Amino acid sequence: MKINRKYFVTLLLVLVVLTGQAQVNPTTALLGSWSGKLKVGIMSLTLVLHLEQADGYVAVTLDSPDQGAKGIAAYKEFLSDDSLAVKVESIGMTYRARLKDGQLDGTFAQNGTTIPLVLTRGVPEVKRPQTPQEPFPYENEEVTFYNEADSATLAGTLTWPMGYDKKTKPAVVLLVTGSGQQNRDEELFGHKPFLVIADFLARQGIATLRYDDRATGKSVGGEVKNATTADFMRDAAAGLAYLRSRKAFGNVGILGHSEGGSIAFMLGAQKKADFIVSLAGPGVKGDSLLVAQSNLIMMLSGALPTMSVEKYREQEAVKQSPWIQWFIDYDPSADIRQTCCPVFALNGDHDCQVIASQNLTAIRRLLLPSKKNLVKEYPALNHLFQHCTSGLPTEYGQIEETISPEVLQDIAQWINNLKQ
């Protein structure tokens, strides 16, 4: 959702750019990369400090991989062979440390709060064991389709099922990402959930089409700055129309994650999909969803939940974002009620962005009665359907798992059962 997977508690990193290089002795022992965990309550943020020499100067930059932030320039206050002090002035942050037993033993400070922070040499290895590796036992086809109404050409990957036979017509699923422009793999923090889903479904006899969002990757054209969910829905509608035009498939369905779940129900109400998989899709009006999201994240982060619908609307009105203004006014109830095709709606009970108790409950109540519908809540899964501890977005990049194997199996089994 429009936490955009970037609504992280501002302990450290707003994307700022400060100039600041230190002219130092080029033999300093602290050159290189240092990393560690900043722990605040139940939260833990990975920080990486880079000290790189160039032309007699040392450039100091910070990364916060768990927040998707890299290359943030820091100002050097002091640097020697055994100690340093760096500052990011615009957010009131400093880090002072001394070399001790091969580690930087120091203190992180921001706006009056001080926290011990130990950094060790090197950058932590990012492990993503579920990311599929070639060779694949199935065919991938690069395709494009066109949304004429918005002059957008969408580029994507059509993945055929393993052992595909032209005499058969397998089910096919269009994969639609959440909010914010993303590539066809819905990539974030090194995770590629849509690639993992496409690979798994191909091995279970199901085809998929995943595509780069408009003006992202190889997709070109289409308004982005002033676009709303309704505009992105037309991109997905063009994808469904393209799949039907191939005349190679049986059921043509749509799997939407987060905002993509809203798009799935919008198209379901228009009877353009044969089935829907809603991964953490909204079930309530946008302003209610985002207020609940904000309050839960504040509470889990140790702050008092103080957001109200009125306060949220006042804050967002100042930003004048067409996307957010459309979203906070959008109530999915009518689209969900008018969706007649089979629906599999799922959420994790640790989802902090689209809260299961609020949204999945609403979807269950609004769906038309059908034995083919399935509504399921998974224990200990977050918004990305990873097994997690708190569910906070700051955990997404720290977790090696991309998506729960149980979720993958349930999606494939449910789609395949529709043929019976």
Can you name each region flagged by the protein language model?
Residues 24-100, 105-113, 130, 138, ...:
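Central antiparallel beta-sheet cores of small beta-barrel/beta-sandwich binding domains
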Residues 124-168:
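N-terminal cap/lid segment of alpha/beta-hydrolase-fold proteins
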Residues 168-179:
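Short beta-strand element of the alpha/beta-hydrolase
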Residues 187-209:
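Short amphipathic alpha-helix adjacent to the substrate-entry channel of hydrolases
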Residues 193, 225-246:
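Alpha/beta-hydrolase active-site loop
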Residues 266-267, 271-338, 353, 369:
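Accessory cap/linker subdomain of secreted extracellular hydrolases
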Residues 339, 345-347:
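Short beta-strand/loop motif that positions the catalytic acidic residue
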Residues 341, 352-366:
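Short alpha-helix in the alpha/beta-hydrolase fold that links the catalytic acid
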